[in-house]
């Protein structure tokens, strides 16, 4: 792709722990989120916006710059985090991806940061909670 090309690809991504087991403890959560964020920041094909979730799944918002393969990217992120945290973290196969416009970025970031409250009060976006796994 030429450096004169323009692409605006914003994605909301979610993936779950193996068997939806609550692997993401309050103790593990900050380290996991920092690990994922740092990997994204170091990747020149991605721009980090937000990460959040609850004990059995992660939500992530990022922008992607071509060329990229989302399936491969998510697989590498899940694999690297499992390797980093060992048996204390296992992921289910599959994921959910939803594209969104830049005008919705603020809302998506807020949705991700408010995951615990949204799940507690059941104020969820069906579209952003979709996931296809085992």
Predicted regions and their residues:
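Basic nucleic-acid-binding interfaces
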Residues: 1-134
């Amino acid at each position: 792709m030429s450096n004169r090309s323009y692409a605006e690809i914003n994605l909301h991504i979610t993936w779950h722990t193996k068997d939806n087991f609550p692997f993401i403890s309050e103790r593990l959560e900050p380290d996991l989120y920092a690990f994922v964020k740092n990997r994204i920041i170091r990747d020149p094909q991605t721009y980090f916006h937000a990460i959040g979730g609850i004990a059995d799944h992660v939500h992530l918002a990022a922008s992607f710059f071509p060329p990229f393969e989302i399936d491969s990217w998510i697989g590498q992120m899940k694999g690297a985090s499992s390797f980093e945290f060992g048996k204390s973290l296992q992921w289910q196969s599959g994921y959910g991806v939803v594209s969104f416009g830049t005008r919705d970025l603020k809302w998506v970031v807020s949705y991700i940061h408010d995951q615990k409250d949204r799940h507690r009060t059941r104020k969820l976006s069906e579209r952003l909670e979709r996931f296809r796994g085992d």
